[in-house]
Structure formats: structure tokens, C-alpha cells
Amino acid sequence: MFDIEEFLNLDNYATEERVKRRKINTKNNDPSGEFFTPYSIVKHMCDKVSDEDWSDPNKTFLEPSFGHGQFILFILYRRIVEYNIDWCTALSTIFGVELMEDNVAECKQRVHKMLEAIAPDYNKDKANNIMNCNFICHDFFTWNFEEWRPMTEEEIKKAKKK
């Protein structure tokens, strides 16, 4: 069985490279302000969302600085496993902006790994199509949100067929 708490345990992602980069960023007062949220805080914050919002397949979630995906993964997991929303719909309603390109790539890899474990009908190409639209490498404060929108029901159906 897939254990979301273990999967989101930051110790599993404290790679030597990440620790080294974090030390350099801190030492040089890097403006990226990179910080990775522990599972306990992610869960506590997500527990504030109502059951009605979790279960509504039309509700969207926006993570303004998603790092390597702690909130995105928790939201996706909860909507699929606890609220029985199909993986394609759940993923298509999650949006994220991240400044660091390597974090975007890592988040996408982690989403694939989790979906392989929890979604029997998971399709990597479909997931990539959705994530390439919904997970953006950009500065949150300068991104044009007016032109960024959730996929329509028709677009979701088309993505599911591919």
C-alpha cells in the first residue's frame, strides 16, 4: 500500500546536492528563498480545506511556489485516494508556479512516481500533457494569470482519450 506520509517525508529528498545548494543559497543570501515544507505542516494546512471543496471535481488548487511538490502531491493523493476523483481530473485541477527549473522537473517526476503507485489507469503521456500546461517555471509575481485557466471538461475528455 502507498504511504503518502513516507512519500512526502523530506528526509527522503535531502540529497547531498539539495543540501549543498541550500547551504550555498543561505550563505549567499540567495533571493530564491527556497524552503521545503515538511509533511506535518502540509497535512495541517490541507486539513483546513472543507470536505465539500476536496470532493468537488471542479475546484481548482493553486500552489504559488511548489518547490519539489509537497502540496501538489498531497492534494493529488487526497483527491484520488480519499475522495475518489479520477487521477486525470484531479491532476487537471491543480496548478503550480515554481521559479527553479530543477524543482519543476523533480515535482513532475514525483507526480509520475505517485500516480504509478495509486492510479491503475495512469498514463504517463496524459499526465505530461496536463503537467506541461499546469506546472509553470516562472516568477509567480509576474505570471499572467488572466490567460491561464483550468482545462474545460471537453479538454479533459480529450486528454483521457489520448
Roles of regions detected by a PLM:
Residues 1-162:
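SAM-dependent methyltransferase catalytic region
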